[in-house]
Amino acid sequence: MKVLGRSFFWVLFPVLPWAVQAVEHEEVAQRVIKLHRGRGVAAMQSRQWVRDSCRKLSGLLRQKNAVLNKLKTAIGAVEKDVGLSDEEKLFQVHTFEIFQKELNESENSVFQAVYGLQRALQGDYKDVVNMKESSRQRLEALREAAIKEETEYMELLAAEKHQVEALKNMQHQNQSLSMLDEILEDVRKAADRLEEEIEEHAFDDNKSVKGVNFEAVLRVEEEEANSKQNITKREVEDDLGLSMLIDSQNNQYILTKPRDSTIPRADHHFIKDIVTIGMLSLPCGWLCTAIGLPTMFGYIICGVLLGPSGLNSIKSIVQVETLGEFGVFFTLFLVGLEFSPEKLRKVWKISLQGPCYMTLLMIAFGLLWGHLLRIKPTQSVFISTCLSLSSTPLVSRFLMGSARGDKEGDIDYSTVLLGMLVTQDVQLGLFMAVMPTLIQAGASASSSIVVEVLRILVLIGQILFSLAAVFLLCLVIKKYLIGPYYRKLHMESKGNKEILILGISAFIFLMLTVTELLDVSMELGCFLAGALVSSQGPVVTEEIATSIEPIRDFLAIVFFASIGLHVFPTFVAYELTVLVFLTLSVVVMKFLLAALVLSLILPRSSQYIKWIVSAGLAQVSEFSFVLGSRARRAGVISREVYLLILSVTTLSLLLAPVLWRAAITRCVPRPERRSSL
């Protein structure tokens, strides 16, 4: 302990010259002001000030070296002390090493400041690039210093905790404990071991990983009216990690995995967002039902009212959109559940040919208009591909319960439409896989275009191979697995419906995971899961649909509300004329192209359904939001084009129910019309 006391004396000793220097700071400042105003003998005072400063700095460095020697001596004495345990030796040595690091970092900070001042004086104040580079270097230095200081602070906290634990152990050794106290002491030690075992050193493990950047963030606590309550809640949130972080790019973050996993936590922002969406969706959907509009309109309006362009009350936007994706998964599963493989055999050629021809025609028209408007071919291809896709979840809602029995030699429009939408989902996965290569091709020199084309062809071949593997897997599952699996679920779920729901959900997630691993869209996996289950017969289909539909309905509400979060009424109002013209142009073009393609590939007896199918394909898919955001981050499209894509997509989705109802009224016989509207 004497060695420890002497060492802490030497810890405090180097700080004294800095305190003296702080007292003299006022005098130095006055001298600088006089020099600036031309008072006094400038040359003599300047030389004297430099000599004094150098003398003080040299003295501090000598004292620092002396302290380092004392610390080395203290470390050697601790290591030779036979009265200390190995753990206590490591602790004391580590404490001395922390202070050594502090002295070295303080010295480095002085010379870094001098170097920074020298660089600033040598630079040109009119050269913005040079000033930017200097600022970047200072920012990097500050980030590294902050990380080092944070690491040192955590080490000091650990040292303090060790001292407290050592004091507790000493007190327990000097007093007799009751049986209950001994049990609690054993529990405390077991809890400490548990925390050490489950704690992940994510910060230390990732701070040196390549590509990791250090950034300054703001930590925002929830406001409370009462200051005392605010302090108490801040202490609790600081412990529970429920505050919000905001970086310099205005991105907001919340806790995903706490350091201490033994304490249960809940994201109250996300809970409030879901509760708010659920409460506001009811009157919005009710109002749309009362005036004869589809309820999805009300859910989108709910998202608009709560989103950034409305009340801005949704804080966990990413989490809400993620939950909404499950609405897409379950919707497509139920679509596949009503999609008979026998019907698919009848229309598989139409389902494959139609979307491919439509996409090629859209890209051709896009390149033509892009050439006339002097738009880059990469942008033209991307925008055309985005606009060629149609919304599978939306059309699935239109088709719920509208499938009808085929007449002899006739084709059901719902089967054709669903088959084409599934093919478009495959195209979506293909395009998302090819898009990075397409971006590189647009940025590469003309000499490497052939290489990029070959790379795209290789990617297309990989996707086609993945599709073949998926369908082969589906054949195996249908023949050998799905029947025994469902029978086992049915036996175990008698009187316990949750086992059936959980088993079907697990099968959906398994299929979407398989398709995602094979670089095919997860949506296709959900659809195929439904189609495989439907192969067990109508009784099975009805039982599973009855169980899954309530889950689908709630998650679909969240999905359509999340679409409303990306609707910006003010932007639409500013550019209403342009947006309405673009939306009508896109909808009319898609409608006419679909009708043209279907008139060429449909049999004569089924030509009348081309208008209904064309109406179902005339809107733009909500997945253009995802494609647009990726393209904007990659620099393929500008911010203005991205907002135009969002607005045109949203307006086309709002126009889709009107066009669908008009097509059904015009082309479907009256007895079959009610279930389709």
Swiss-Prot record:
Pfam families reported for this sequence: Na_H_Exchanger
A GO molecular-function annotation: potassium:proton antiporter activity
Endpoints of the signal sequence: 1-22
Domain of life the protein comes from: Eukaryota
Entry-listed glycosylation sites: N206, N230
Membrane topology per record: Multi-pass membrane protein
Entry protein name: Transmembrane and coiled-coil domain-containing protein 3
Annotated source species: Homo sapiens
Underlying gene: TMCO3
